[in-house]
Protein backbone atom coordinates (compact mmCIF):
# COMPACT_ATOMS: atom_id res chain seq x y z
CA UNK A 1 0.00 0.00 0.00
CA UNK A 2 1.32 3.43 -0.96
CA UNK A 3 2.11 5.66 2.01
CA UNK A 4 2.05 8.89 0.00
CA UNK A 5 -0.35 11.69 0.95
CA UNK A 6 -0.71 14.64 -1.40
CA UNK A 7 -1.67 18.28 -1.02
CA UNK A 8 -1.83 21.33 -3.26
CA UNK A 9 0.06 24.50 -2.22
CA UNK A 10 -2.79 26.92 -2.80
CA UNK A 11 -4.00 30.47 -2.36
CA UNK A 12 -7.65 31.54 -2.46
CA UNK A 13 -8.99 34.65 -4.16
CA UNK A 14 -12.58 35.72 -3.57
CA UNK A 15 -14.32 37.84 -6.26
CA UNK A 16 -17.17 38.53 -3.83
CA UNK A 17 -18.64 37.14 -0.63
CA UNK A 18 -22.17 38.18 -1.56
CA UNK A 19 -24.43 35.21 -2.23
CA UNK A 20 -28.10 34.78 -3.07
CA UNK A 21 -28.09 31.49 -1.16
CA UNK A 22 -28.43 31.68 2.60
CA UNK A 23 -27.32 28.31 3.98
CA UNK A 24 -27.82 28.44 7.72
CA UNK A 25 -24.43 26.83 8.43
CA UNK A 26 -22.39 29.22 6.28
CA UNK A 27 -19.45 31.24 7.61
CA UNK A 28 -18.53 32.71 4.22
CA UNK A 29 -21.38 34.65 2.65
CA UNK A 30 -22.67 38.20 2.93
CA UNK A 31 -26.00 39.56 1.71
CA UNK A 32 -26.25 40.73 -1.92
CA UNK A 33 -25.07 44.31 -2.19
CA UNK A 34 -23.25 44.19 1.15
CA UNK A 35 -19.86 42.97 -0.06
CA UNK A 36 -17.43 44.86 -2.26
CA UNK A 37 -16.06 43.02 -5.27
CA UNK A 38 -12.39 42.24 -5.68
CA UNK A 39 -10.72 44.47 -8.26
CA UNK A 40 -8.26 43.08 -10.78
CA UNK A 41 -5.59 45.46 -9.51
CA UNK A 42 -5.99 44.24 -5.92
CA UNK A 43 -5.98 40.64 -7.11
CA UNK A 44 -2.78 41.29 -9.03
CA UNK A 45 -1.14 42.68 -5.88
CA UNK A 46 -2.14 39.56 -3.97
CA UNK A 47 -0.87 37.21 -6.65
CA UNK A 48 2.40 39.05 -7.22
CA UNK A 49 3.14 38.72 -3.51
CA UNK A 50 3.02 34.93 -3.97
CA UNK A 51 5.61 34.71 -6.73
CA UNK A 52 8.45 32.29 -5.96
CA UNK A 53 6.95 31.39 -2.57
CA UNK A 54 5.78 27.90 -3.42
CA UNK A 55 2.15 28.54 -4.37
CA UNK A 56 0.94 26.51 -7.34
CA UNK A 57 -2.86 26.61 -7.30
CA UNK A 58 -5.04 29.70 -7.31
CA UNK A 59 -8.48 28.74 -6.08
CA UNK A 60 -11.18 31.17 -7.18
CA UNK A 61 -13.95 30.80 -4.63
CA UNK A 62 -17.01 33.04 -4.74
CA UNK A 63 -20.44 33.72 -3.42
CA UNK A 64 -23.11 33.23 -6.08
CA UNK A 65 -24.84 36.00 -8.00
CA UNK A 66 -28.34 34.96 -9.07
CA UNK A 67 -28.53 33.72 -12.69
CA UNK A 68 -31.20 36.34 -13.45
CA UNK A 69 -29.38 39.22 -11.77
CA UNK A 70 -28.29 42.18 -13.87
CA UNK A 71 -24.88 41.73 -12.25
CA UNK A 72 -24.44 38.10 -13.31
CA UNK A 73 -22.53 38.90 -16.50
CA UNK A 74 -20.11 41.24 -14.69
CA UNK A 75 -19.64 38.62 -11.95
CA UNK A 76 -18.79 35.94 -14.48
CA UNK A 77 -16.46 38.21 -16.44
CA UNK A 78 -14.59 39.06 -13.24
CA UNK A 79 -14.11 35.37 -12.45
CA UNK A 80 -12.86 34.73 -15.99
CA UNK A 81 -10.41 37.63 -15.85
CA UNK A 82 -9.10 36.55 -12.44
CA UNK A 83 -8.32 33.13 -13.89
CA UNK A 84 -6.61 34.76 -16.87
CA UNK A 85 -4.57 36.88 -14.48
CA UNK A 86 -3.48 33.85 -12.47
CA UNK A 87 -2.40 32.07 -15.65
CA UNK A 88 -0.47 35.10 -16.88
CA UNK A 89 1.56 35.03 -13.67
CA UNK A 90 2.33 31.33 -14.03
CA UNK A 91 -0.15 29.89 -11.52
CA UNK A 92 -2.68 27.11 -12.12
CA UNK A 93 -6.31 28.18 -11.61
CA UNK A 94 -9.06 26.03 -10.10
CA UNK A 95 -12.54 27.56 -9.88
CA UNK A 96 -15.41 26.74 -7.52
CA UNK A 97 -18.08 29.44 -7.71
CA UNK A 98 -21.34 27.54 -7.40
CA UNK A 99 -23.91 26.66 -10.04
CA UNK A 100 -22.95 27.68 -13.58
CA UNK A 101 -24.64 27.33 -16.94
CA UNK A 102 -23.17 24.85 -19.38
CA UNK A 103 -21.85 27.68 -21.55
CA UNK A 104 -20.23 29.35 -18.52
CA UNK A 105 -18.51 26.08 -17.66
CA UNK A 106 -17.34 25.73 -21.25
CA UNK A 107 -15.82 29.21 -21.14
CA UNK A 108 -14.12 28.66 -17.78
CA UNK A 109 -12.57 25.45 -19.08
CA UNK A 110 -10.37 27.66 -21.26
CA UNK A 111 -8.77 29.32 -18.21
CA UNK A 112 -8.85 26.58 -15.55
CA UNK A 113 -6.90 23.35 -15.20
CA UNK A 114 -9.72 21.94 -13.05
CA UNK A 115 -12.98 23.00 -11.46
CA UNK A 116 -15.15 21.98 -8.53
CA UNK A 117 -18.54 22.00 -6.86
CA UNK A 118 -19.53 20.33 -3.61
CA UNK A 119 -22.49 18.02 -4.05
CA UNK A 120 -22.88 18.11 -0.23
CA UNK A 121 -25.86 15.74 0.09
CA UNK A 122 -28.46 14.75 -2.48
CA UNK A 123 -31.30 14.17 -0.04
CA UNK A 124 -34.08 16.72 -0.75
CA UNK A 125 -35.02 16.90 2.93
CA UNK A 126 -32.23 19.43 3.53
CA UNK A 127 -34.21 21.90 1.41
CA UNK A 128 -36.56 22.13 4.38
CA UNK A 129 -33.77 22.61 6.91
CA UNK A 130 -30.31 24.10 6.28
CA UNK A 131 -30.95 24.76 2.57
CA UNK A 132 -34.47 26.17 2.81
CA UNK A 133 -33.20 29.60 1.66
CA UNK A 134 -30.69 28.25 -0.86
CA UNK A 135 -32.12 27.86 -4.38
CA UNK A 136 -28.90 26.58 -5.93
CA UNK A 137 -28.62 23.75 -3.40
CA UNK A 138 -31.41 21.82 -5.13
CA UNK A 139 -29.76 18.41 -5.66
CA UNK A 140 -30.65 17.91 -9.33
CA UNK A 141 -29.01 21.24 -10.23
CA UNK A 142 -25.75 20.15 -8.64
CA UNK A 143 -25.91 16.70 -10.18
CA UNK A 144 -26.44 18.37 -13.55
CA UNK A 145 -23.26 20.35 -12.98
CA UNK A 146 -21.29 17.14 -12.45
CA UNK A 147 -22.78 15.71 -15.66
CA UNK A 148 -21.86 18.80 -17.66
CA UNK A 149 -18.32 18.73 -16.31
CA UNK A 150 -18.01 15.19 -17.60
CA UNK A 151 -19.48 16.03 -21.00
CA UNK A 152 -17.08 18.98 -21.30
CA UNK A 153 -14.07 16.90 -20.13
CA UNK A 154 -13.32 19.17 -17.19
CA UNK A 155 -11.22 17.56 -14.43
CA UNK A 156 -13.48 17.94 -11.43
CA UNK A 157 -13.57 17.91 -7.64
CA UNK A 158 -16.75 17.36 -5.66
CA UNK A 159 -17.55 16.22 -2.16
CA UNK A 160 -19.83 15.58 0.79
CA UNK A 161 -20.58 17.90 3.68
CA UNK A 162 -21.26 15.86 6.82
CA UNK A 163 -23.37 16.73 9.82
CA UNK A 164 -25.98 19.01 8.26
CA UNK A 165 -29.02 16.85 8.94
CA UNK A 166 -28.33 13.82 6.77
CA UNK A 167 -28.18 10.10 7.63
CA UNK A 168 -25.73 7.28 6.90
CA UNK A 169 -28.04 6.19 4.08
CA UNK A 170 -27.81 9.71 2.65
CA UNK A 171 -24.00 9.45 2.64
CA UNK A 172 -24.21 6.26 0.63
CA UNK A 173 -26.79 7.67 -1.78
CA UNK A 174 -24.64 10.73 -2.44
CA UNK A 175 -21.50 8.65 -2.93
CA UNK A 176 -23.35 6.32 -5.31
CA UNK A 177 -24.59 9.30 -7.33
CA UNK A 178 -21.01 10.54 -7.69
CA UNK A 179 -19.84 7.05 -8.61
CA UNK A 180 -22.50 6.66 -11.30
CA UNK A 181 -21.64 9.97 -12.96
CA UNK A 182 -17.91 9.28 -12.80
CA UNK A 183 -18.29 5.84 -14.34
CA UNK A 184 -20.00 7.51 -17.29
CA UNK A 185 -17.40 10.24 -17.88
CA UNK A 186 -14.28 9.43 -15.80
CA UNK A 187 -13.68 13.06 -14.87
CA UNK A 188 -13.83 13.23 -11.07
CA UNK A 189 -10.35 13.63 -9.61
CA UNK A 190 -11.24 13.90 -5.94
CA UNK A 191 -14.11 13.60 -3.53
CA UNK A 192 -13.79 15.74 -0.40
CA UNK A 193 -15.18 14.27 2.81
CA UNK A 194 -15.76 17.43 4.85
CA UNK A 195 -17.07 17.46 8.41
CA UNK A 196 -19.29 20.44 9.16
CA UNK A 197 -17.47 22.57 11.72
CA UNK A 198 -19.42 25.42 13.39
CA UNK A 199 -17.95 28.90 13.17
CA UNK A 200 -18.57 32.37 14.50
CA UNK A 201 -20.88 33.47 11.66
CA UNK A 202 -23.26 30.56 11.19
CA UNK A 203 -26.92 30.93 12.20
CA UNK A 204 -27.56 27.22 12.65
CA UNK A 205 -27.08 25.91 16.19
CA UNK A 206 -25.09 22.69 15.94
CA UNK A 207 -22.12 21.02 17.57
CA UNK A 208 -20.86 20.05 14.14
CA UNK A 209 -20.07 16.62 12.79
CA UNK A 210 -18.56 14.13 15.23
CA UNK A 211 -15.10 13.73 13.70
CA UNK A 212 -14.64 10.45 15.54
CA UNK A 213 -16.98 9.04 12.87
CA UNK A 214 -14.89 10.36 10.00
CA UNK A 215 -12.78 7.21 9.51
CA UNK A 216 -16.02 5.25 9.14
CA UNK A 217 -17.24 7.62 6.42
CA UNK A 218 -13.90 7.32 4.63
CA UNK A 219 -14.21 3.53 4.72
CA UNK A 220 -17.71 3.72 3.23
CA UNK A 221 -16.55 6.13 0.52
CA UNK A 222 -13.57 3.91 -0.26
CA UNK A 223 -15.95 1.00 -0.76
CA UNK A 224 -18.56 2.85 -2.85
CA UNK A 225 -16.39 5.03 -5.09
CA UNK A 226 -14.20 3.77 -7.94
CA UNK A 227 -10.56 3.31 -6.95
CA UNK A 228 -9.40 5.97 -9.43
CA UNK A 229 -11.08 8.73 -7.40
CA UNK A 230 -8.90 10.18 -4.65
CA UNK A 231 -10.47 10.75 -1.24
CA UNK A 232 -9.62 14.10 0.34
CA UNK A 233 -9.93 15.30 3.93
CA UNK A 234 -9.25 18.86 5.18
CA UNK A 235 -6.64 18.60 7.96
CA UNK A 236 -7.66 21.89 9.60
CA UNK A 237 -11.07 20.37 10.36
CA UNK A 238 -9.59 17.18 11.81
CA UNK A 239 -7.72 18.38 14.88
CA UNK A 240 -7.08 14.98 16.44
CA UNK A 241 -3.95 13.41 14.91
CA UNK A 242 -5.23 9.90 15.60
CA UNK A 243 -8.42 10.60 13.60
CA UNK A 244 -6.46 12.06 10.69
CA UNK A 245 -4.21 9.00 10.65
CA UNK A 246 -7.19 6.64 10.89
CA UNK A 247 -8.74 8.37 7.87
CA UNK A 248 -5.56 7.73 5.91
CA UNK A 249 -5.51 4.08 6.93
CA UNK A 250 -9.11 3.79 5.70
CA UNK A 251 -8.34 5.20 2.27
CA UNK A 252 -7.98 9.00 2.27
CA UNK A 253 -4.93 10.07 0.27
CA UNK A 254 -5.15 13.84 -0.16
CA UNK A 255 -5.32 16.87 2.15
CA UNK A 256 -6.59 19.37 -0.40
CA UNK A 257 -5.37 22.89 -0.96
CA UNK A 258 -3.30 24.18 1.93
CA UNK A 259 -2.59 27.89 2.11
CA UNK A 260 -2.55 30.92 4.40
CA UNK A 261 -6.29 30.96 5.15
CA UNK A 262 -9.41 28.81 4.83
CA UNK A 263 -12.07 31.18 3.47
CA UNK A 264 -14.94 28.74 4.01
CA UNK A 265 -13.89 27.84 7.56
CA UNK A 266 -12.15 31.00 8.81
CA UNK A 267 -12.26 29.83 12.43
CA UNK A 268 -10.09 26.83 11.58
CA UNK A 269 -6.54 27.73 10.49
CA UNK A 270 -4.55 25.26 8.45
CA UNK A 271 -2.00 23.26 10.46
CA UNK A 272 1.62 24.31 10.32
CA UNK A 273 3.39 22.42 7.55
CA UNK A 274 6.15 20.99 9.74
CA UNK A 275 3.66 19.92 12.42
CA UNK A 276 1.64 18.11 9.78
CA UNK A 277 4.71 16.33 8.44
CA UNK A 278 5.60 15.21 11.97
CA UNK A 279 2.15 13.68 12.50
CA UNK A 280 2.24 11.89 9.15
CA UNK A 281 5.79 10.62 9.44
CA UNK A 282 5.00 9.13 12.85
CA UNK A 283 3.02 6.46 10.97
CA UNK A 284 5.18 6.24 7.88
CA UNK A 285 3.23 8.62 5.64
CA UNK A 286 5.04 10.89 3.20
CA UNK A 287 3.53 14.31 2.38
CA UNK A 288 4.13 15.43 -1.18
CA UNK A 289 2.97 18.29 -3.41
CA UNK A 290 0.62 17.84 -6.33
CA UNK A 291 -0.81 20.06 -9.04
CA UNK A 292 -4.54 20.95 -9.12
CA UNK A 293 -4.89 18.71 -12.18
CA UNK A 294 -3.94 15.03 -12.12
CA UNK A 295 -1.58 13.93 -14.89
CA UNK A 296 -4.10 11.54 -16.45
CA UNK A 297 -6.20 14.59 -17.37
CA UNK A 298 -3.44 16.71 -18.93
CA UNK A 299 -4.57 15.80 -22.44
CA UNK A 300 -8.04 17.19 -21.70
CA UNK A 301 -6.63 20.71 -21.30
CA UNK A 302 -6.46 23.42 -23.96
CA UNK A 303 -2.93 23.47 -25.40
CA UNK A 304 -1.87 26.69 -23.65
CA UNK A 305 -2.89 25.29 -20.26
CA UNK A 306 -1.29 21.95 -21.03
CA UNK A 307 2.00 23.73 -21.71
CA UNK A 308 1.91 25.61 -18.38
CA UNK A 309 1.07 22.39 -16.53
CA UNK A 310 3.95 20.62 -18.28
CA UNK A 311 6.35 23.34 -17.11
CA UNK A 312 5.20 22.83 -13.51
CA UNK A 313 5.58 19.06 -13.80
CA UNK A 314 9.13 19.41 -15.05
CA UNK A 315 10.00 22.06 -12.46
CA UNK A 316 8.75 20.03 -9.49
CA UNK A 317 9.13 16.51 -10.92
CA UNK A 318 5.41 15.90 -10.36
CA UNK A 319 4.13 13.38 -12.89
UniProtKB/Swiss-Prot annotation:
Q: Which UniProt keyword terms apply here?
A: 4Fe-4S, Iron, Iron-sulfur, Lyase, Metal-binding, S-adenosyl-L-methionine
Q: In which pathway does it act?
A: Cofactor biosynthesis; coenzyme F0 biosynthesis
Q: Cofactor(s) for this protein? A: [4Fe-4S] cluster
Q: Name the InterPro entries on file.
A: Aldolase_TIM, CofG_family, Elp3/MiaA/NifB-like_rSAM, F420, rSAM
Q: What is its EC number?
A: 4.3.1.32
Which catalysed reactions does the entry list for this protein? 5-amino-5-(4-hydroxybenzyl)-6-(D-ribitylimino)-5,6-dihydrouracil + S-adenosyl-L-methionine = 7,8-didemethyl-8-hydroxy-5-deazariboflavin + 5'-deoxyadenosine + L-methionine + NH4(+) + H(+)
| Annotated ranges, domain Radical SAM core | 5-236
How is the subunit organization of this protein annotated in UniProt?
Consists of two subunits, CofG and CofH.
The protein in question is named 7,8-didemethyl-8-hydroxy-5-deazariboflavin synthase
Amino acid sequence: MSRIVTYSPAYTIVPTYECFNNCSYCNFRSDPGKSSWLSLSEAEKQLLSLKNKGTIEILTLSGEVHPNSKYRKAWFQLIYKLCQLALSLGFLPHTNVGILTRSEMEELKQVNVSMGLMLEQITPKLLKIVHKNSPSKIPHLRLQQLEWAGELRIPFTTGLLLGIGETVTDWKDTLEAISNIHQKWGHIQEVIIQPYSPGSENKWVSDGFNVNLLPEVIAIANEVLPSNITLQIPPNLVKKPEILLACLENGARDLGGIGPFDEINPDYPHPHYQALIKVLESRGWQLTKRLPVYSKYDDWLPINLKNIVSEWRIKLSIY
